[in-house]
């Protein structure tokens, strides 16, 4: 009996936390595949305004272009 109550409580807590996560971070569930396209159009002012996460994405994009594996995706 206790284990059923514990499982139900765990399931409800997961559902509630998932609901609040989607309400707090709705953009995290949107597909943003054009982020790399946005990095193609950077100028000096844009580079100065980049967040650390953008710099990581820019570095990953540059490494992907430099790698030999990139040719396999074309």
From Swiss-Prot:
GO terms for cellular component: extracellular region. Expressed by the venom gland. GO terms for biological process: defense response to bacterium. It is found in: Secreted. The keyword Transport does not apply. Keywords: Antibiotic, Antimicrobial, Secreted, Signal. Residues 1-24 form the signal peptide. It comes from the Eukaryota. May be an antimicrobial peptide. Belongs to the non-disulfide-bridged peptide (NDBP) superfamily. Long chain multifunctional peptide (group 2) family. This is Anionic peptide clone 8. It comes from Tityus costatus (Brazilian scorpion).
């Amino acid at each position: 009996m206790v284990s059923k109550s514990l499982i139900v409580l765990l399931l409800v807590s997961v559902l509630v936390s998932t609901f609040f996560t989607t309400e707090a971070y709705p953009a995290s569930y949107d597909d943003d595949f054009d982020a790399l396209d946005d990095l193609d159009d950077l100028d000096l002012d844009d580079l100065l305004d980049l967040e650390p996460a953008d710099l990581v994405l820019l570095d990953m994009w540059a490494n992907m272009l430099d790698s030999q594996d990139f040719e396999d995706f074309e």
